[in-house]
């Protein structure tokens, strides 16, 4: 009896999944993904959604967005975003199955969504075409569009689209608009600390501020900065600045003339001066490998 109920329940679940997939395929079918290889997108689903929300609430809506080519975006910002949002971006096919599995397990244990498993490609699909709508088939739409994006566009183009359409505050879209709004500089002039702060707030740009980070964002800043330093993408000094730590104390300067002066110390007759000390061996400087160099 129990076994029969199990198989009946499984059959029902599979039937529902098949139905949702079919609905998703039909709904996203008309979307032109390949055209994004040649031109920039218009206003995204998220932009239109925010405008509707403002209109419904009777509040003014302002939109700031500036398109900037990927090569004109700070390399540290690119790397920080990848570390924060999708560390396997250049190796997956649009879906990170390990992350999906881990997120599903954590969410089931917590009985709520505590961790997302979306890749940058999935986030781009959501931002451009789906918005925040909650339907049983929306996740399938996102998965299908992500796979289509990966088939039709290069990784660099996907990253460029993502950085130019992502939301970074109320009415602020794209990295250049965000850099100018929060820090008064263009996307190419962002320093390491600014880049890390912008990457840290992507999880909820409406709630969190890159210039006044709370404890959760401070923890994310530390995580991103630590990974970038470990991979040689930022220096020790940049790491300390990003975390608000004081600079390391410099070694006291040594007067080089003292090293060459003769020893005039008074000694008993017959006692010779001690031999000069052997110089300390100098360790060879290590070369850091930039594991995110593909985005540089």
Which residues fall in each region the model found?
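Juxtamembrane regions of bacterial inner-membrane/periplasmic proteins
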Residues: 1-296
């Amino acid at each position: 009896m129990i076994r029969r109920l199990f198989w009946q329940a499984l059959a029902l679940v599979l039937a529902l999944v098949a139905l949702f997939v079919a609905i998703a395929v039909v709904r996203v079918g008309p979307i032109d993904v390949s055209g994004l290889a040649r031109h920039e997108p218009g206003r995204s689903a998220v932009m239109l959604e925010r405008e509707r929300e403002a209109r419904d609430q009777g509040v003014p809506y302002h939109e700031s967005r500036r398109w900037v080519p990927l090569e004109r975006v700070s390399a540290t910002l690119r790397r920080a975003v990848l570390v924060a949002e999708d560390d396997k971006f250049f190796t997956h096919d649009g879906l990170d199955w390990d992350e999906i599995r881990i997120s599903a397990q954590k969410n089931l244990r917590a009985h709520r969504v505590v961790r997302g498993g979306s890749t940058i490609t999935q986030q781009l699909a959501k931002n451009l075409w789906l918005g925040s709508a909650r339907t049983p088939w929306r996740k399938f739409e996102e998965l299908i569009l992500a796979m289509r994006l990966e088939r039709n566009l290069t990784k660099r183009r996907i990253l460029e689209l993502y950085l130019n359409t992502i939301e970074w505050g109320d009415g602020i879209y794209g990295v250049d608009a965000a850099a100018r709004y929060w820090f008064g500089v263009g996307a190419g002039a962002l320093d390491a600390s600014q880049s890390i702060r912008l990457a840290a707030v992507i999880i909820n740009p409406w709630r969190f501020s890159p210039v006044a980070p709370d404890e959760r964002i401070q923890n994310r800043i530390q995580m991103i900065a630590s990974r970038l330093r470990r991979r040689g993408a930022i220096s020790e000094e940049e790491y300390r600045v990003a975390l608000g730590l004081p600079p390391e104390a410099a070694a006291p300067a040594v007067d080089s003339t003292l090293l060459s002066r003769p020893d005039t110390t008074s000694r008993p007759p017959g006692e010779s001066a001690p031999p000069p000390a052997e110089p300390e061996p100098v360790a060879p400087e290590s070369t850091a490998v930039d594991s995110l160099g593909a985005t540089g």
